[in-house]
Regions:
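Sec/Tat signal peptide C-region and signal peptidase I cleavage site
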Residues: 17-23
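Short, polar/charged alpha-helical segment
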Residues: 29-52, 61, 65
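Short helices/loops that flank or line small-molecule/ion binding pockets
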Residues: 45, 60-74, 87-88, 136-138, ...
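Short beta-strand-to-loop elements that line the ligand-binding cleft
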Residues: 50-58, 148-156, 170-176
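Ligand-binding "clamshell"
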Residues: 84-96, 109-111, 185-187, 192, ...
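A conserved helix-loop-strand patch within extracytoplasmic ligand-binding domains
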Residues: 96-146, 249
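Periplasmic-binding protein-like
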Residues: 97-108, 133-140, 199, 203-266
Length: 266
């Protein structure tokens, strides 16, 4: 009888361990649109993941949450922003999936064509370093400003307003917190808005933007990011594979109509 009890104890222990593994929650911080929507779709197609989506609100730094262990991954940022955050926080993170692009767009409630922009028009742009640079390159691509010589590749040269060489319309560049820019549309002539914030505001980038960032060779693909210690965690790897799957790519294409563009799962 005592001999028989050991296998039973082993079975009980195995069941308990299996339960604990299954119960382990994978907490991922994400912007509400489209990131959290995409993650919630993953929950539907892969019930083996015990995924908890933490929707970010303004003022919360998802990389600080990750560094502090409050979440196991985040999904909201592109590589240039991530690299700036690593420097600012003194942390090293790990990219485990490259998922989609949200083209930056120029929007207006005042004009219907960029040719109609008046002299000394006000332009709201993101105030964080990487997206500010991205906005200036978009304004240059649409003929509104010209940056200094050599500023042709946003992946290589980060631009600031001091790098504007030509501003023929004397545009006034106003740096604003990215989530607040859609609310400023009635107060400025032009607004350069990140794709996710445009979608949250009810805009359709592929239709409403007067100028839209090209997806070709775009360095701003959105990433699933974790810590080096967790990058080989089975749940993290499973989520990464799901996000880069053809199913998720199809979901993005069908639901965002060119306003969000998949870069994996083609």
């Amino acid at each position: 009888m005592r001999y028989a009890s050991f296998p039973l104890a082993g079975i009980a222990l195995s069941v308990a361990l299996a339960f604990n593994v299954q119960a382990a929650e994978l907490r991922v911080a994400a912007d509400p649109v489209p990131h959290a929507e995409i993650l919630n779709y993953v929950k539907k197609i892969d019930p083996s993941l015990n995924l908890k989506v933490i929707e970010l609100t303004s003022g919360i730094n998802a990389n600080e949450l990750l560094a502090n262990g409050d979440v196991q991954a985040n999904y909201f940022q592109h590589a240039p922003y991530l690299h700036d955050q690593e420097k600012a926080l003194g942390q090293k993170f790990a990219v485990v999936a490259t998922v989609h692009i949200e083209p930056l767009g120029i929007y207006s409630h005042k004009v219907k064509n960029l040719k109609d922009v008046k002299d000394k028009a006000t332009v709201a742009v993101p105030n964080n370093v990487t997206n500010l640079s991205r906005a200036l390159y978009l304004l240059q691509a649409n003929g509104l400003i010209k940056l200094k010589e050599g500023f042709t590749d946003p992946a290589k040269n980060q631009a600031t307003p001091q790098d504007i060489a030509e501003n023929p319309k004397q545009l006034k560049i106003l740096e604003v917190e990215s989530p607040q820019i859609p609310r400023s549309l009635d107060d400025v002539d032009l607004a350069v808005i990140n794709g996710n914030y445009a979608l949250e505001a009810g805009l359709v980038p592929a239709k409403d933007a007067l100028g839209l960032e090209s997806a070709t060779n775009n360095p701003y693909a959105n990433l699933l990011v974790t810590t080096p210690a967790l990058q080989n965690d089975p749940q993290i790897k499973k989520l990464a594979a799901d996000l880069e799957s053809p199913q998720v790519a199809d979901f993005i294409r069908k639901n965002y109509n060119g306003s969000v563009i998949p870069v994996a799962g083609q």
